[in-house]
Amino acid sequence: MAKMLGAGRWGGCRSWHNLRARRPQLRRTTPVLVAIVLLFAAAASAQEMEPRTFSPSPVGTNFVVFAVNHASGSVLVDPSLPVTDIHASNTVNVLGLGHVFDLFGRQALITGVLPYANADVTGNVGGNAREVQRSGLADAQAKLSVLLLGGKALTPGEFAQAHHGMVIGVSVGVMAPTGQYYPQYLINLGTNRWATRLEGGISIPRGRWMFEGSAGVGLYGDNDLFYPGERHKSQQSIKGLQGHVSYTFRPRMWVAFDGTWYTGGRVDLDGVRGADFQRNSRLGATFALPLTRRQSLKFAYSTGATTRLGGDFDTFSVAYQMVWFGKRPTPPQVAPPPGGGLPH
C-alpha cells in the first residue's frame, strides 16, 4: 500500500493541488514528472540488458528465479523547468518462472515475472523540497522467445551430443497493467496501460567466447486515467540496440560485458507533445556462478554512459536460479484383449 510521508509530499497532496491550480506551470513541469513515473516501468523497457537471452536449452527445462534489483541515481531534466535535484531509488523483488518447450520443432521459452517494488523519489519543486515513497506490486510481465535458426528442439540427451553454433531468435514480451496505480497520485508503481516489446537477436559462439547483438522496440498503450485522473497520456515507441561479449570459464560460469543504446519515448498529455525525448546509453557487466548442478547465482551491474534526459541510474542485481528437467509423459499402456492376441 502506498505510504505518504506527511503533508506537502508528492502525490495526492496539497502541494500538487496548488500546482494544478497554476495550469501554465503544471504543463511545463508535468512532462518531467512523467519521466519519473516511467522509471518504475522497467520490464518492457529498452534499458534492460540481458546477455544470453537466446541461448539454446533442452526441451523440458524448467527454472525458478528469485532476484533483487536496486537502481538509484539522479533524474536529468530540462533546466528551464522549476524541478531540480531529483533523486530516485527503486528496489524490486522479483519472482520469475520459465519453461522450455517444443514449438513446431523449434526451441521456445515462455517466462513470467511478478515484481514487488519499493520506490523513493525526492526533489525540489518551485524551491520546495518534496518526497514520496511507494511500496507494492509493479506490472507483471510475460515473454515468449523462439529460436528460428540453430535452435532445433532437443531432448536433454540429444542436446548434450549436439554441436551448438550460431543462433537467431525472436521474442515478444507483454507487460500487463497489474501494478499498484492510483489516478490521484502522480508517481505510481504501475503504469495503468499495456505494453509490448518485440526483439530479434543473434548469438555467435567462438570457442569460450560468445558475441551477441539484438534490436528491439517497445510499444505502449494509452493511459486514460493519468494524474489527477482525468488526463490522457500516450507514449511513443522506444527503440533500442544491445550488444554483449561473454567468456565462459567452465560450464554455467561466465562473465559478460554489456552495452545498450535506446531512443524515443516522447510523452503526449491530452494531445500536447512533451519535451522528454530520450537518447541514452548504458554499460554494464554480468557474472554467472554455479552453486550446484541445478542452482546458480547471477550478479549484474550497469551505469549510464550517456544520458540526454531521464534516469542516470546505477543498478545492481543479484538473482538465485534453480533448474530442473521435466519428464516426457509416458504413453498409456493398453491391456491386450483376452487370449493374448491382437483384436481382429
Residue spans of the language-model regions?
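Residues that define the transmembrane beta-barrel architecture of outer-membrane proteins
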Residues: 60, 87-95, 135-142, 166, ...
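Repeated loop/turn-to-beta-strand initiation elements of outer-membrane beta-barrel proteins
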Residues: 62, 74-75, 105-108, 151-152, ...
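Transmembrane beta-strands of outer-membrane beta-barrel proteins
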Residues: 62-64, 108-112, 142, 166-172, ...
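Residues on the lipid-exposed face of transmembrane beta-strands in outer-membrane beta-barrel proteins
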Residues: 66-68, 95-99, 142-148, 172, ...
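Transmembrane beta-strands of outer-membrane beta-barrel pores
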Residues: 68-74, 114-120, 148, 174-180, ...
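Surface-exposed strand-loop-strand hairpins of Gram-negative outer-membrane beta-barrel proteins
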Residues: 71-92, 130, 183-190
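Outer-membrane pore/translocation modules
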Residues: 118-234, 275-276
